[in-house]
């Protein structure tokens, strides 16, 4: 039986990490379509949690609920609770600007803004904070360093971000997301449009970033989930089937559906 090789534990302490994000009895509807069904999940702080499952299972939908990006579109409704540090972000009283600063997101395809590299990173900061020129320069440099991009762009910050390679653009998007110093970083298949070398660099970056951020990553690549995550959640047809430590999910899953998926029997 084919199984995914899971790397040795990546230095995470054995003690239970504090819960950063928790979904409680979460349902989601696309108009009348019931896309997520009673999801209950706890996302540990400063760990990487991977969401896996076949296309259409609800993993990207769940990710988008964590920052309420669905609220930009009509006829979409979430019911239940999503707690960030114990506060329900689905409450109408929870400020959207606050949520956007606390939960960053990087999408499947790099989406640099049509402006300079510097302004791409500074853009979000300007909307949330008033910094001096020197402080802004320091913040942009720090974000680009966290995005593992500084050494490649430090001499061309005034050039268009559209001239960067695909892998560089995605790291720029990560730098732009962390520039606001969020608590949580959401990654929606961040390497699916990249070559193997760029993919490897992003995976290394994820490992580095979890020292400072709680990370949730959606991936169709089970080998990637095994490499980068501390915890893995398997979803199927809008249900959360199983959620456990990654080494457990890939070596001793408790549910037959999980076993069938990771061994390639369906998906």
UniProtKB/Swiss-Prot annotation:
Return the GO cellular component terms, semicolon-separated: plasma membrane
Topology relative to the membrane = Peripheral membrane protein
Q: Do the record's keywords include 4Fe-4S?
A: no
Identify the residues that the record assigns to the ABC transporter domain, covering every copy. 21-262
Which amino acids does the record list as binding ATP?
A: 53-60
EC number assigned by the record: 7.3.2.1
| Broad EC category | translocase
Q: Looking at the Swiss-Prot or TrEMBL record, what is one Pfam family this protein matches?
A: ABC_tran
Q: Which UniProt keywords apply?
A: ATP-binding, Cell inner membrane, Cell membrane, Membrane, Nucleotide-binding, Phosphate transport, Translocase, Transport
Chemical reaction(s) catalysed = phosphate(out) + ATP + H2O = ADP + 2 phosphate(in) + H(+)
This protein's superkingdom? Bacteria
Q: Name one GO molecular function term.
A: ATPase-coupled phosphate ion transmembrane transporter activity
One biological process term from GO is:
phosphate ion transmembrane transport
Where is this chain primarily localised? membrane
Does the UniProt entry include the keyword Transmembrane? Answer: no
Q: Where in the cell is it found?
A: Cell inner membrane
User: What role is this protein assigned?
Assistant: Part of the ABC transporter complex PstSACB involved in phosphate import. Responsible for energy coupling to the transport system.
The family line of this record is: Belongs to the ABC transporter superfamily. Phosphate importer (TC 3.A.1.7) family.
Q: How does it assemble?
A: The complex is composed of two ATP-binding proteins (PstB), two transmembrane proteins (PstC and PstA) and a solute-binding protein (PstS).
* Protein known as: Phosphate import ATP-binding protein PstB
Which organism encodes this protein?
Answer: Xanthomonas campestris pv. campestris (strain ATCC 33913 / DSM 3586 / NCPPB 528 / LMG 568 / P 25)
């Amino acid at each position: 039986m084919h199984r995914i090789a899971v790397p040795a534990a990546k230095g995470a302490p054995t003690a239970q990490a504090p819960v950063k994000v928790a979904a409680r009895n979460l349902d989601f509807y696309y108009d009348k379509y019931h896309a997520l069904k009673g999801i209950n999940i706890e996302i540990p702080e400063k760990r990487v949690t991977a969401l896996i499952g076949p296309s259409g299972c609800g993993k990207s939908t769940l990710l988008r609920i964590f920052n309420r990006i669905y609220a930009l579109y009509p006829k979409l409704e979430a019911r239940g609770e999503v707690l960030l540090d114990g506060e329900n972000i689905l409450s109408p009283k929870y400020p959207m600007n606050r949520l956007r600063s606390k939960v960053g997101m990087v999408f499947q395809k790099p989406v640099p803004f049509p402006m300079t590299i510097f302004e791409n990173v500074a853009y979000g900061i300007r909307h949330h904070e008033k910094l001096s020129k020197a402080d802004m320069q320091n913040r942009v440099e720090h974000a680009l360093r966290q995005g593992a991009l500084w050494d490649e762009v430090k001499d061309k910050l005034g050039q268009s971000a559209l001239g960067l390679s695909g892998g560089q653009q995605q790291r720029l998007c990560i730098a732009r997301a962390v520039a606001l110093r969020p608590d949580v970083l959401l990654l929606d298949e961040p390497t699916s449009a990249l070559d193997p070398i760029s993919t490897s660099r992003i995976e290394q970056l994820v490992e580095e970033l979890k020292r400072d951020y709680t990370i949730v990553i959606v991936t169709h690549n089970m080998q990637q989930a095994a490499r980068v995550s501390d915890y893995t959640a398997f979803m199927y047809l809008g249900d959360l089937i199983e959620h456990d430590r990654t080494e457990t999910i890939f070596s001793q899953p408790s549910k037959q559906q999980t076993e069938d998926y990771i061994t390639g029997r369906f998906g």
